[in-house]
Regions:
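Short acidic, Gly/Ser-rich segments with clustered Asp/Glu that frequently serve as metal-coordination loops
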Residues: 37-43
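Active-site-adjacent betaalpha module
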Residues: 1-30, 72-77, 101-230
């Protein structure tokens, strides 16, 4: 049961019906680049894998560009950046029920590689991913607590599976989730939209990349004002 071949689509920008208006706070937030590995991205027709045949307007490529902006902004603001990455050649005892839905998963080191355009640096943390949620069989929650962080900015694939599940679990652990709609991609525009609608009404603030950057700029300006007064 392999991943489906995903047709290009564009996620239509819309006003999300958020029940919360949490601002992104650079002193509280971390960024999670979710499952942006070759195995998952190559399922998208026209995905930019560095081979020169990309469809620029396809949502996966919009997401890649926006994730790059978010990573750069996070580094500049001192926000820790985390990645999830599933390991290749998983033992059936580790993979278990995922086999029934998705088969054997990643089979080689190349398929497990994070895209070059988004590759982690030495300052970033890569979490081994075992289930839909980034928190399962992972030190993620402990790392957040140790660093005093309780906001989670999420971008990557797939919006309605791992990204949404991670947002839900963050919420249930009293960590404020932020789903960055234009830095996500999914099996279809409909599933992408449904994931964002569910998150905005049940567990997260859904926003776009420009909103994250604006919140960071507001926080930086406020900090500068406070320093000037001191």
């Amino acid at each position: 049961m392999a991943l489906p071949k995903i047709k290009p689509y564009t996620y239509v920008d819309r006003e999300h019906s958020n029940r919360v208006s949490w601002p992104v706070d650079p002193s509280r937030a971390v960024l999670l680049v979710h499952d942006m590995q070759v195995h998952f991205v190559q399922a998208f027709e026209g995905a930019d894998l560095g081979e020169g045949n990309a469809s620029p307007d396809a949502q996966i490529n919009v997401a890649i560009r926006n994730l790059r902006r978010l990573i750069d902004a996070a580094h500049a603001a001192g926000i820790p950046v985390y990645y999830t990455a599933q390991p290749p050649r998983q033992n059936p005892e580790d993979r278990r029920l995922l086999i029934d839905f998705w088969g054997d998963g990643l089979q080689n080191d190349e398929s497990a590689r994070v895209l070059d355009a988004l590759a982690p640096t030495d300052r970033d943390t890569v979490l081994t991913k075992w289930r839909y949620s980034a928190f399962v069989r992972s030190p993620f929650e402990d790392l957040l607590k140790e660093s005093g962080r309780d906001q989670l900015i999420i971008g990557g694939v797939y919006a309605h599976i791992g990204c949404l599940t991670t947002a839900l679990e963050a919420f249930m652990r009293d960590i404020q989730p932020f789903m960055v709609a234009d830095a996500l991609a999914d099996f279809s525009e409909e599933e992408h939209r449904l994931a964002c609608e569910y998150a905005s009404g049940r567990c997260a603030r859904v926003l776009n990349t420009v909103d994250v950057l604006a919140d960071l700029q507001t926080a930086e300006s406020a900090e500068g004002t406070e320093e000037a007064r001191a």
